[in-house]
Amino acid sequence: EFKEAFSLFDKDGDGTITTKELGTVMRSLGQNPTEAELQDMINEVDADGNGTIDFPEFLTMMARKMKETDSEEEIREAFRVFDKDGNGFISAAELRHVMTNLGEKLTDEEVDEMIREADIDGDGQVNYEEFVAMMTSK
């Protein structure tokens, strides 16, 4: 997957991509780096500072980025699965199901408490931001 994406943006086939193309490559792989993050990643791997990145450097960079975002993406996917109507909210019952499927062994009381804490406006539903905050707070 990475080699195909890399090759797509290695226009002249010389084994390097320009830093300008990096953002496009990463977005095609489902990443969404900020400009600052792109510059940081480029600086980390572009040893000679010539503005191009070879494939081994690219793999190193993607491995770092994906390790950072893996758990967040897993949470995002879990949220999508149980947000049945795709409206950006999950119900309390759906949340209970999500927690069970993520391997959390919680009592009903514990789940109810999490729902109360996460459900800021008290409408019985939890939006994505609230869900992520709940799942990542320990």
From Swiss-Prot:
Keyword Nuclease appears in the UniProt entry: no
Single GO term (MF): calcium ion binding
A Pfam family of this chain: EF-hand_7
InterPro entries from the UniProt entry: CALM/Myosin/TropC-like, EF-hand-dom_pair, EF_Hand_1_Ca_BS, EF_hand_dom
One GO location term (cellular component): myosin II complex
Domain of life (superkingdom): Eukaryota
Residues noted as binding Ca(2+) 3 in the record, renumbered to the chain: D83, D85, N87, E94
Keywords for this protein: Calcium, Metal-binding, Repeat
Residues reported in the UniProt entry to bind Ca(2+) 1: D10, D12, D14, T16, E21
Residues holding Ca(2+) 4: D119, D121, D123, Q125, E130
UniProt domain EF-hand: residue ranges: 1-32, 33-68, 70-105, 106-138
Residues binding Ca(2+) 2: D46, D48, N50, T52, E57
SMART domains cross-referenced by the UniProt entry: EFh
Job of this protein: Calmodulin mediates the control of a large number of enzymes, ion channels and other proteins by Ca(2+). Among the enzymes to be stimulated by the calmodulin-Ca(2+) complex are a number of protein kinases and phosphatases.
Family to which this protein belongs: Belongs to the calmodulin family.
Further details from the record: This protein has four functional calcium-binding sites.
Protein name (database record): Calmodulin-beta
Gene source species: Arbacia punctulata (Punctuate sea urchin)
